Amino acid sequence: MKKKVFCILMAMTMTTSALTGCGSKASTASATGSNTAATEANGDSAASADLSSYVSSAEEGKVINIYCWNDEFRTRVEAVYDKVDHTSEDGTITYLTDGTEIHWTVNPNQDGVYQKKLDEALMNQANAATDDKIDMFLSETDYVVKYTDAEADIAIPLTALGIDPAADLGDQYDFTKTVASDASGLQRGSTWQACPCLFAYRRDIAKDVFGTDDPDEIHAKVADWATMKASGEELKAKGYFTLASYADTFRAYGNSIANPWVASGSTEINVDPQIMNWINDSKEWLDAGLLDKNVKGQWTDDWNKSQGSASKVFGFLLPAWGIDFVLKPNWDGADGEWAVTDGPQAFNWGGSFVHGCSGTDNPEHVKDIILAVTANKDNLLKITKDYLDFTNTKSGMTEIANDDSFGAEFLGGENPFKYFQPAAESITMTTLSPYDQGCVELIQSSFSDYFQGQVDFDTAKANFERAIKERYPEITAVNWPE
C-alpha cells in the first residue's frame, strides 16, 4: 500500500473533508461529463491497475473487515449475498458458508465521527495485522471524493478487482458511476442505490386544504417553487406549514449548482447563484410563515417530531431512503397516511458508496460482495421490494415503476417508483470537490441565524467566510455572485 496514502490522510485528519497534504493541491472527482471518457479511463486502467499493488497477501484471508455507519449495508449483504450463513445476535459478525467472517465496525456519521475513525484506521493500515486490515468501507456523496482521489489511492479501482464498469455495471445510473470515479474517470466504488427525491405529503392535510390527496393533483400544487409558495398560503390559512425547515429545501438547490464549490486546482470557494436563491427563498418563506420557525434544521428532535401525527407540517422532500429510514420511524400514526408525488424540481440526495480498501487481503470476497449488492439486477430488485430502496438498476426501476401490482404499504399501496424512476433519469450533478461537505454544512449553519433574524445578511456572509477558512486554512477567498 502506497506511503502517500498515509501522508494525505494525516492532512485530512486535521481538515476532515480536505485532501491537501504532502504539498499537493486538492483534486476533484467529476460527477458529470463524458461517459465515453469515463469508459476509456476504466478500460485503459484494466491493464495498468495491478491488483498486487493493492493487496497485502497472496492468499485470501479469513476475516473481512468492513467499516460503515449503520446496519443498512449489512442488511443488504445479508439479503442478497449467497455466501451468508448467519449473523451474530449483536450484529457484529456475519459468518459465511466458506468459513470466512465479516466483522462490522460501525461508527456514527454525525459530527464526522465515522470519517475520523476510518481515517485513523487507514493510517494504521500498513502496520495492522492481516486480519485487522480494512477490506471494505463505505462513503457518502458529500465526502466520497476524499477516498476516490487518485493521489490518495485509498479506494481500489474496480478494474483492479476484476470488475468492468462498462459491462458489469452497465445498467447503473450514470451519475452514480461518475460520482464514484476519480478525476480521470477511473471508477473506485459502486453503490446499490440511486437517490432521486420526491415530495412526501400528509394525505389528511391534503384533503383538508385542497380537497384531494391524489398524487397528480397534489403535484399541480407543488409543480415549481412559485406554485408551491402560492399553495403554501392556502396551507397557512388553515394552520399548516408547507415544509418544516429551510434545511428541507437545501439539497434541491445545492445539488443543482452549475459549478463546483472549489474548482480543480483552486483555493477559492465560489458560491453558486443557486445557493443565493436558497438563501433568499428561505428567508422569504420563513418570514411569510410557510416554514416552522421552531425547526432550525434537520436531524434535530424538533425536526423528527414534525414528521409525527401531531405536527402541522404538510410534507418533506425525501429520497427513498428518507421514507424508509426517517419518515416511517418518526410517524406514529397508521400506514397509508402519507403519499408521494413529484416535487418542484428533480434532485439527488445521498448515496452510500462501497469501496475495496487498499491493503486488503480479501480481494476476491470484496469483488463478490460489490457485484452481489450493486450489480446483480435480481438482487437489486429484491432489495427494492424488501426495503423500498430505489436501487441502481435502470431497467429494474423501469420494471418496478410500470408494475401495477407493486405498492408500498406505508404509502397506502401507492407505487412511489412511478415518480422516482423518471426523476432519476433527469438527474445531473456537477463536479464534486473535497470541500463540498464543509461548504454544505457551514453555509447552512452560518445563515440559520440570519433566517431567524438574529444577524443581518452581511454578518451571515462574514460568519461563513470565517468558518470555512477556519475549517480549511488553505482557502484564500470566498467569491459571492453579483
Descriptions of predicted regions:
Residues C7-I8, C22-V145, H365, V455-E482:
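Conserved N-terminal structural module of periplasmic/extracytoplasmic solute-binding proteins
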Residues S17-G21:
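C-terminal motif of bacterial Sec signal peptides marking the signal peptidase cleavage site
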Residues E40-V55, G112, A126, T130, ...:
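Hinge/lid segment of periplasmic solute-binding proteins
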Residues K62, D98, M123, G185, ...:
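Extracytoplasmic/periplasmic substrate-recognition and gating elements
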Residues V113-K117, A121, Y240, S245-D248, ...:
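Extracytoplasmic ligand-binding clamshell segments of periplasmic binding protein
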Residues T159-G170, T178-T249, V262-K296, S358-E364, ...:
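Helix-loop-helix "hinge/cap" segment bordering the ligand-binding cleft or interdomain interface
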Residues T384-D449, A477-E482:
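Long, aromatic- and glycine/proline-rich binding clefts that accommodate carbohydrate-like moieties
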